[in-house]
């Protein structure tokens, strides 16, 4: 706080004064941290194994069945009765996470056909392949948030650079940039993704690269407007008169003020990225088949109307994430509003 400028401190206080946005930020960070530690919460491997008075940590390191008295040089199925008997013979025990299933682990002990309703074993039920719904929500939310954060960072980097160059130099640079933006923004992104998915199997990085080609367009106009206004201010003219380079003027004197409007847009870019990935997964053009995904879970709910817990769980998880981001974005917008 002491190193912040008076203006930055006022903005921080205004943001903290918005209780809805402030607590939404903390709740979103807590949920994100929860998903990052998903392997410690939902996993078919134990957190800790005590075997012959030695400790093993299968979550962090791969062990073979032979290390626990078995015969095969492969990773054991810790949930099987055979491995449990091996551990018991070694006077040991296993400590499993609260959810003893990973996102791709089927529950072979179901007494009814999948998808099965919520139970003491599967708290939110299973999907149509007997996989734990809560585990898939945790890992699916992590993929969505990481995808959105990466896409937002790339979009901000490209959008701020393009908008700064257009607004600062103006003239033919601005004119050419605007014409290119008009053409580029007119391309149908969804149809392009559908067409390309027929030639290349989509994955995380492939989708990120394609979406990054278009998601930066929304920031360009905001940054461009700030630079068009800022380049004519007196202190910018004075910096030029002193012989400072264009790079120094852009980075030190105009960009910090232009970031005020840009920061308030970032949460909404996050929501757009999460919604887009969910929609693509729902349509079957997103993450590879079998990947944990909120959109894929919603699609399963549509195909299995007799199992409402599938669609409702994914819907509420998605709605919670998007609502928190919208509240954070509104609080940031109010905090950076010069009229407040």
Regions found by a protein language model. Name each.
Residues 1-156, 160, 164-165, 300, ...:
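Gly/Trp-centered helix-boundary motif
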Residues 126-340:
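Alpha-helical transmembrane segments of integral membrane proteins
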